[in-house]
Amino acid sequence: MGRIFLTGEKANSVLKRYPRANGLFEEIRQGNIERECKEEVCTFEEAREAFENNEKTKEFWNTYTKAQQGESNRGSDWFQFYLTFPLIFGLFIILLVIFLIWRCFLRNKTRRQTVTESHIPFPQHLNIITTPPPPDEVFDNSGLSPGFLEYVVGRSDSVSTRLSNCDPPPTYEEATGQMNLRRSETEPHLDPPPEYEDIINSNSASAIAMVPVATTIK
């Protein structure tokens, strides 16, 4: 028999319980089968080994199974909440980040548009329509009449439109207004040419009028 069964000391030396990671807490608060079965999932055999009595084991097992069923029912009610709440919270954070990024992008875009609009120069070929001045203010501070200013503006507009239409630039005569004078000078005379006798008479008269000059050589 001694070879088949071990004594108590030898059995405890072989079959012993190793301490857990919270061994210090277990030394302060000694555990029991009820607390261990509530904290962990235990079986009927483990409870019978702990109580070593069938009546106490059955009584404990009935209360333990009822408590486990109640806790499982309460846990199933909260399971959906524990599952959906993190998803809803994460989706809200993602939407908030997307909204902030879109807001910053829109603000930067509006700032760029305002800066570019402020730097765009005013086109020079556009005319500004203003009300006519009163008759007292016929001349401005520079001494130029409004008619002269309108003439200058109209000429600049014609030149700008000609340049925009890819026409060649105006000549010097067109720019200075001397085109009509040059045309009048180049036009042929309408008088008939002089006759041959008139040319001879004019040449003879000029020869008689000339006085000879005598030179002396010493």
UniProtKB/Swiss-Prot annotation:
Record-annotated Gla domain positions: 20-66
Name of a matching Pfam family: Gla
Keyword Disulfide bond included in the entry's annotation: yes
Residue stretches of biased makeup (Basic and acidic residues): 182-192
Localization of this protein: Membrane
Keywords annotated in UniProt: Disulfide bond, Membrane, Transmembrane, Transmembrane helix
PTM characteristics: Gla residues are produced after subsequent post-translational modifications of glutamate by a vitamin K-dependent gamma-carboxylase.
Record region (Disordered): 160-192
Disulfide bonds: 37-42
GO annotation, biological process: blood coagulation
GO cellular component: extracellular space; membrane
Residue ranges of coiled coil: none
Protein name from the UniProt record: Transmembrane gamma-carboxyglutamic acid protein 1
Organism, as annotated: Bos taurus
Classification lineage: Eukaryota, Metazoa, Chordata, Craniata, Vertebrata
Gene name of the record: PRRG1
